[in-house]
Amino acid sequence: MILNITAYFIIPVYTFLFAWGTDLFRLNFSVLGSLANRKNAFLLWGIIVGIYVLRKIIHHLPRNRKETVTSVSALILLAFAVTTPYLPENRPFRAFLHVIFAFSASVLLLACLYLIVWKLYCMNREVYRPYFICLNIITVLSAMLLCLAGIVSSALEIFFTVSCTLMLIRLYRRVTSSRDGYYSLKHKV
């Protein structure tokens, strides 16, 4: 129940509200998070997304060492990104680090999702094909938004966050459903 509320309501609404009233194609969460009135909101957004995506969902999906290292690295980089201020005029090196942390966290999350979905797809192509296609669509549309704006924009960050969250809750429900043997085999005593 709490996973559904978080996935279908809290993360999408909070993500949209965080960027509300701003130019979605000229600004990004880094710029918004550096504003005094949005600093705590940015930190809270990072905590919600980090805990939900990387701990509650990916933790329960099939993974081996590669996926574990990738997801933990993404979580650490996300934590670094939301706690490293993006102030290019005052602190250019920290701003540079912030960009590296944020971008790397997203790339590692995407890589982790591909590793997990690919593993499931190889186990049962018919069942997990929609998730593999969905992940490819998320990747292509994210690349298109990046090219359209020329920067990692709020529009891209909103799309990526919400679409990955919604895909993950559906994948999580599929993997943990009784119709799929993976979860029951994994958690047998």
Language-model-derived ranges and their functions:
Residues 76-132:
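Membrane-proximal helix-loop-helix units in multi-pass membrane proteins
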Residues 3, 7, 45, 73, ...:
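Physicochemical signature of membrane-embedded alpha-helices that form the seven-helix bundle of GPCRs
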Residues 8-14, 41-56, 105-116, 160-175:
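Hydrophobic cores of alpha-helical transmembrane segments in multi-pass inner/ER membrane proteins
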Residues 30-34, 91-105, 153-163:
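Non-cytosolic membrane-interface motifs at loop->transmembrane helix junctions
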Residues 1-61:
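N-terminal topogenic module of multi-pass integral membrane proteins
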